[in-house]
C-alpha cells in the first residue's frame, strides 16, 4: 500500500509539472514578463498538494502582507517545502535556487523563463552575480525566497545558516521575513522515494528590519534570523499530531 501510494504521488507530481510547466514557459514571456508565471506556479503547487493528500495551514500571513521587496527565510526539510511556500506565501515570489534545478526539463526551463535566480554554490563569482540579480528583483518589488541552510536536512533538525541571504538583505535594505515549515519531513525526505500524506504547519514571523546595519552585522543578523525560525518552528510543530511534529532519529532519516 505504501509503495502504491508513493507511486501515485510521484505520478501526480510529474503530470502536474508537465501540465502547468509547459504553458507557464510561454506565459512567462507575456508582458509584463514573468508576471503571468506565478498563477501557474501556485496552481501547480496546490494541485500537487491536493493530489498527494498534503493539507497545509498557515498562520501569520498578515505579518508579511505589506512587506513588498522582502527576503523570505525558510527552513528546508523536504522537496515539498517548495510546493508549500508557493501555495501560502503572499506577494510576487521568486526563488533563489540551486543551479542544477535549471537543467531539469520543463521545470528548469519554466524557472529560467520566469526569472528565478540560479545559484552555483561552488562558484563564488557566479554566486555574487546571482545576488546582484536577486537584488534587482527585490528593488522591483518582488519577494525572494531563500533557504539559508542551502540544502535539505537529513535529520529533521535545523542546519547552520549560510550568509548569502543576509548579505542580500543588507545590500538592498530589504527586511528578512522568517518562515517556519513543520511536517514536510514526515511527508518526504531528501533522496527518498516514499511519500506519505499528512499535515503541514507554516508560521510566518515578524519582519526583521535591517536598516542601519552593515556587513559587519552579518553574523549577528544570521543568528537572529535562525533563532526566529527555530522559535516559529517549535510553535508550528506543537500544532501537529505528535507523529508528524517529531523528528525521526538520524538512522530513520537515512532509510
Predicted regions and their residues:
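Membrane-embedded segments
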Residues: 79-129, 133
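Conserved H-X4-D acyltransferase segment
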Residues: 5-12, 41-97
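Non-catalytic C-terminal accessory region of glycerolipid acyltransferases
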Residues: 128-255
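A transmembrane-helix-recognition feature enriched in membrane-embedded lipid enzymes
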Residues: 1-57, 109-114
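Short, flexible loop segments at the rims of nucleotide/cofactor-binding pockets, characterized by
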Residues: 48-51, 72-73, 121-125, 154-156
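Short, hinge-like loop/turn segments at secondary-structure boundaries
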Residues: 75-76, 112-114, 194-197
Amino acid at each position: 500500500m505504501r509503495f502504491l501510494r508513493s507511486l501515485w504521488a510521484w505520478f501526480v507530481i510529474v503530470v502536474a509539472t508537465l501540465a502547468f510547466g509547459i504553458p507557464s514557459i510561454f506565459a512567462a514571456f507575456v508582458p509584463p514578463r514573468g508576471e503571468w508565471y506565478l498563477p501557474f506556479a501556485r496552481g501547480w503547487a496546490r494541485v500537487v498538494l491536493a493530489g498527494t493528500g498534503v493539507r497545509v495551514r498557515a498562520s501569520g500571513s498578515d505579518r508579511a502582507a505589506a512587506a513588498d521587496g522582502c527576503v523570505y527565510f525558510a527552513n528546508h526539510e523536504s522537496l515539498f517545502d517548495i510546493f508549500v511556500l508557493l501555495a501560502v506565501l503572499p506577494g510576487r515570489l521568486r526563488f533563489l535556487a540551486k543551479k542544477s534545478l535549471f537543467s531539469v526539463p520543463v521545470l528548469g526551463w519554466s524557472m529560467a523563463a520566469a526569472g528565478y535566480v540560479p545559484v552555483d554554490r561552488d562558484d563564488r563569482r557566479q554566486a555574487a552575480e546571482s545576488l546582484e540579480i536577486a537584488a534587482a528583483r527585490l528593488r522591483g518589488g518582488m519577494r525572494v525566497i531563500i533557504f539559508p541552510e542551502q540544502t535539505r536536512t537529513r535529520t529533521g533538525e535545523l542546519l547552520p545558516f549560510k550568509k548569502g541571504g543576509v548579505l542580500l538583505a543588507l545590500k538592498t535594505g530589504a527586511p528578512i521575513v522568517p518562515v517556519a515549515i513543520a511536517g514536510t519531513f514526515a511527508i518526504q525526505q531528501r533522496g527518498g522515494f516514499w511519500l506519505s500524506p499528512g499535515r503541514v504547519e507554516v508560521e510566518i514571523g515578524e519582519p526583521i528590519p535591517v536598516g542601519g546595519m552593515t556587513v559587519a552585522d552579518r553574523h549577528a543578523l544570521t543568528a537572529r534570523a535562525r533563532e526566529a525560525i527555530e522559535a516559529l518552528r517549535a510553535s508550528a510543530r506543537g500544532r501537529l499530531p505528535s507523529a508528524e511534529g517529531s523528528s525521526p532519529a538520524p538512522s530513520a532519516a537515512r532509510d
